[in-house]
Amino acid sequence: LKDRGHIKAGDVLLILGAAGGVGISAIELGKAYGARVIAAVSSEEKAAVARECGADDVVIYGRPPFDKAQSKALAEQFKAACGPNGANIVYDIVGGDYSEPAVRAIAWEGKFLVVGFPAGIAKLPLNLTLLKSCDVCGVFWGAFTVREPKKNAAHIAELFELLKAGKIAPRVSARFPLAEGGKAIAMLENRQAVGKVVVTMD
Protein backbone atom coordinates (compact mmCIF):
# COMPACT_ATOMS: atom_id res chain seq x y z
CA LEU A 1 0.00 0.00 0.00
CA LYS A 2 2.78 2.41 0.84
CA ASP A 3 5.53 1.58 -1.68
CA ARG A 4 3.42 0.45 -4.63
CA GLY A 5 0.10 2.18 -3.95
CA HIS A 6 1.51 5.48 -2.60
CA ILE A 7 -1.44 5.59 -0.22
CA LYS A 8 -2.32 8.93 1.36
CA ALA A 9 -5.05 10.44 3.51
CA GLY A 10 -8.30 10.89 1.60
CA ASP A 11 -7.67 8.07 -0.89
CA VAL A 12 -10.40 5.55 -1.65
CA LEU A 13 -9.06 2.01 -1.17
CA LEU A 14 -11.01 -0.95 -2.62
CA ILE A 15 -9.91 -4.31 -1.19
CA LEU A 16 -10.94 -7.56 -2.91
CA GLY A 17 -10.94 -10.49 -0.49
CA ALA A 18 -11.04 -8.15 2.48
CA ALA A 19 -11.95 -10.62 5.25
CA GLY A 20 -8.90 -12.90 5.12
CA GLY A 21 -5.70 -12.27 7.04
CA VAL A 22 -4.12 -10.13 4.31
CA GLY A 23 -7.39 -8.30 3.63
CA ILE A 24 -8.01 -7.39 7.26
CA SER A 25 -4.44 -6.09 7.49
CA ALA A 26 -5.12 -3.95 4.41
CA ILE A 27 -8.32 -2.55 6.00
CA GLU A 28 -6.45 -1.60 9.17
CA LEU A 29 -3.48 -0.11 7.31
CA GLY A 30 -5.78 1.80 4.97
CA LYS A 31 -7.56 3.35 7.93
CA ALA A 32 -4.24 4.07 9.69
CA TYR A 33 -3.10 6.02 6.60
CA GLY A 34 -6.37 7.97 6.45
CA ALA A 35 -8.03 6.27 3.48
CA ARG A 36 -11.73 5.58 2.95
CA VAL A 37 -11.86 1.77 2.81
CA ILE A 38 -14.29 -0.30 0.73
CA ALA A 39 -14.17 -4.01 1.61
CA ALA A 40 -15.29 -6.54 -1.01
CA VAL A 41 -16.17 -9.95 0.45
CA SER A 42 -18.14 -13.09 -0.35
CA SER A 43 -20.65 -13.32 2.54
CA GLU A 44 -22.62 -11.39 5.15
CA GLU A 45 -20.48 -12.97 7.89
CA LYS A 46 -17.31 -11.66 6.24
CA ALA A 47 -18.95 -8.27 5.67
CA ALA A 48 -19.62 -8.00 9.42
CA VAL A 49 -15.98 -8.79 10.17
CA ALA A 50 -14.77 -6.20 7.64
CA ARG A 51 -17.00 -3.56 9.25
CA GLU A 52 -15.72 -4.51 12.74
CA CYS A 53 -12.17 -4.01 11.44
CA GLY A 54 -12.95 -0.50 10.22
CA ALA A 55 -14.23 -0.75 6.64
CA ASP A 56 -16.30 2.30 5.69
CA ASP A 57 -18.44 0.39 3.19
CA VAL A 58 -18.81 -3.22 2.06
CA VAL A 59 -19.63 -4.92 -1.24
CA ILE A 60 -20.75 -8.56 -1.14
CA TYR A 61 -19.96 -10.34 -4.38
CA GLY A 62 -21.12 -13.68 -5.76
CA ARG A 63 -19.11 -16.68 -6.89
CA PRO A 64 -17.59 -16.80 -10.38
CA PRO A 65 -17.61 -17.54 -13.23
CA PHE A 66 -19.35 -14.28 -14.17
CA ASP A 67 -20.99 -13.67 -17.52
CA LYS A 68 -20.74 -10.18 -19.07
CA ALA A 69 -23.90 -8.94 -17.34
CA GLN A 70 -22.73 -10.18 -13.92
CA SER A 71 -19.29 -8.66 -14.42
CA LYS A 72 -20.85 -5.33 -15.38
CA ALA A 73 -23.22 -5.46 -12.38
CA LEU A 74 -20.29 -6.06 -10.02
CA ALA A 75 -18.41 -3.12 -11.56
CA GLU A 76 -21.46 -0.95 -10.88
CA GLN A 77 -21.54 -2.13 -7.25
CA PHE A 78 -17.86 -1.22 -6.87
CA LYS A 79 -18.42 2.19 -8.51
CA ALA A 80 -21.39 2.95 -6.26
CA ALA A 81 -19.38 2.10 -3.14
CA CYS A 82 -16.24 3.96 -4.23
CA GLY A 83 -18.02 7.16 -5.21
CA PRO A 84 -17.98 9.27 -8.37
CA ASN A 85 -14.19 9.44 -8.73
CA GLY A 86 -13.57 5.72 -8.24
CA ALA A 87 -10.93 3.88 -6.21
CA ASN A 88 -7.49 5.47 -6.01
CA ILE A 89 -6.10 2.06 -5.07
CA VAL A 90 -7.44 -1.42 -5.76
CA TYR A 91 -5.81 -4.06 -3.54
CA ASP A 92 -6.58 -7.34 -5.32
CA ILE A 93 -5.96 -10.42 -3.23
CA VAL A 94 -8.28 -12.76 -5.19
CA GLY A 95 -7.84 -12.23 -8.96
CA GLY A 96 -9.97 -14.22 -11.39
CA ASP A 97 -13.29 -12.76 -12.54
CA TYR A 98 -13.23 -10.15 -9.75
CA SER A 99 -10.34 -8.14 -11.19
CA GLU A 100 -11.88 -6.67 -14.33
CA PRO A 101 -14.92 -5.16 -12.54
CA ALA A 102 -12.52 -3.57 -10.04
CA VAL A 103 -10.42 -2.02 -12.83
CA ARG A 104 -13.64 -0.57 -14.25
CA ALA A 105 -14.18 1.14 -10.87
CA ILE A 106 -10.65 2.56 -10.56
CA ALA A 107 -9.98 6.30 -10.46
CA TRP A 108 -8.11 8.27 -13.09
CA GLU A 109 -4.40 7.50 -12.53
CA GLY A 110 -5.33 4.91 -9.91
CA LYS A 111 -3.14 2.02 -8.82
CA PHE A 112 -4.21 -1.62 -9.24
CA LEU A 113 -2.13 -3.79 -6.90
CA VAL A 114 -1.89 -7.49 -7.81
CA VAL A 115 -1.38 -9.22 -4.46
CA GLY A 116 -2.71 -12.74 -5.13
CA PHE A 117 -4.97 -14.82 -7.33
CA PRO A 118 -6.61 -17.78 -5.54
CA ALA A 119 -9.66 -17.29 -7.80
CA GLY A 120 -7.43 -17.64 -10.89
CA ILE A 121 -5.10 -15.44 -12.91
CA ALA A 122 -7.07 -12.45 -14.15
CA LYS A 123 -7.36 -11.60 -17.84
CA LEU A 124 -7.55 -7.81 -17.92
CA PRO A 125 -8.54 -5.92 -21.08
CA LEU A 126 -5.57 -3.57 -21.38
CA ASN A 127 -7.69 -0.89 -23.05
CA LEU A 128 -9.14 -0.22 -19.58
CA THR A 129 -5.71 0.77 -18.29
CA LEU A 130 -5.43 3.28 -21.13
CA LEU A 131 -8.92 4.70 -20.53
CA LYS A 132 -8.21 5.13 -16.81
CA SER A 133 -4.52 6.06 -17.23
CA CYS A 134 -3.96 3.66 -14.32
CA ASP A 135 -0.99 1.58 -13.19
CA VAL A 136 -1.09 -2.19 -12.67
CA CYS A 137 1.56 -3.16 -10.10
CA GLY A 138 2.69 -6.54 -8.85
CA VAL A 139 3.26 -6.88 -5.11
CA PHE A 140 5.59 -9.75 -4.17
CA TRP A 141 6.57 -9.29 -0.54
CA GLY A 142 8.77 -12.41 -0.43
CA ALA A 143 11.08 -11.11 -3.16
CA PHE A 144 10.94 -7.59 -1.72
CA THR A 145 12.38 -8.79 1.61
CA VAL A 146 15.41 -10.22 -0.22
CA ARG A 147 15.92 -7.36 -2.69
CA GLU A 148 15.18 -4.47 -0.30
CA PRO A 149 16.12 -5.70 3.21
CA LYS A 150 16.61 -2.19 4.68
CA LYS A 151 13.29 -0.93 3.38
CA ASN A 152 11.60 -4.09 4.64
CA ALA A 153 13.14 -3.63 8.09
CA ALA A 154 11.85 -0.03 8.16
CA HIS A 155 8.36 -1.25 7.23
CA ILE A 156 8.42 -3.89 9.97
CA ALA A 157 9.47 -1.23 12.49
CA GLU A 158 6.57 0.97 11.32
CA LEU A 159 4.14 -1.95 11.69
CA PHE A 160 5.27 -2.45 15.29
CA GLU A 161 4.68 1.26 15.96
CA LEU A 162 1.15 0.95 14.53
CA LEU A 163 0.61 -2.16 16.66
CA LYS A 164 1.76 -0.31 19.80
CA ALA A 165 -0.57 2.57 18.93
CA GLY A 166 -3.51 0.14 18.64
CA LYS A 167 -4.07 0.94 14.95
CA ILE A 168 -3.50 -2.64 13.79
CA ALA A 169 -4.03 -5.98 15.55
CA PRO A 170 -3.73 -9.53 14.21
CA ARG A 171 -7.12 -11.24 14.13
CA VAL A 172 -6.80 -15.02 14.60
CA SER A 173 -10.00 -16.89 13.77
CA ALA A 174 -8.75 -20.49 14.03
CA ARG A 175 -5.84 -22.45 15.52
CA PHE A 176 -4.77 -25.98 14.66
CA PRO A 177 -1.99 -28.17 16.08
CA LEU A 178 0.65 -29.17 13.52
CA ALA A 179 -0.84 -32.68 13.34
CA GLU A 180 -4.04 -31.10 11.96
CA GLY A 181 -2.29 -28.67 9.61
CA GLY A 182 -4.25 -30.14 6.70
CA LYS A 183 -7.44 -28.74 8.21
CA ALA A 184 -5.92 -25.26 8.22
CA ILE A 185 -4.98 -25.59 4.55
CA ALA A 186 -8.47 -26.89 3.70
CA MET A 187 -10.00 -23.90 5.49
CA LEU A 188 -7.95 -21.57 3.28
CA GLU A 189 -8.68 -23.54 0.10
CA ASN A 190 -12.42 -23.49 0.80
CA ARG A 191 -12.32 -19.73 1.46
CA GLN A 192 -13.67 -20.21 4.98
CA ALA A 193 -10.88 -18.29 6.71
CA VAL A 194 -11.79 -15.01 8.36
CA GLY A 195 -8.60 -13.34 9.54
CA LYS A 196 -5.52 -15.44 10.26
CA VAL A 197 -5.47 -19.22 10.52
CA VAL A 198 -2.62 -20.35 12.78
CA VAL A 199 -0.83 -23.70 12.98
CA THR A 200 0.80 -24.18 16.40
CA MET A 201 3.97 -26.21 16.91
CA ASP A 202 3.08 -27.64 20.34
Language model features by range: what are they?
Residues 31-97, 151:
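Adenosine-nucleotide cofactor-binding segment
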Residues 17-18, 94, 117:
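NAD(P)H cofactor-binding loop motif with strongest signal on the N-terminal glycine-rich segment
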Residues 41, 50, 97-168, 200-202:
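Glycine-rich phosphate-binding loop and adjacent beta-alpha segment
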Residues 3-7, 81-84, 104:
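Glycine-rich helix-loop-beta junction characteristic of Rossmann-like nucleotide cofactor-binding loops
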Residues 9-10, 87, 109:
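Phosphate-coordination loops involved in phosphoryl transfer and adenosine-cofactor binding
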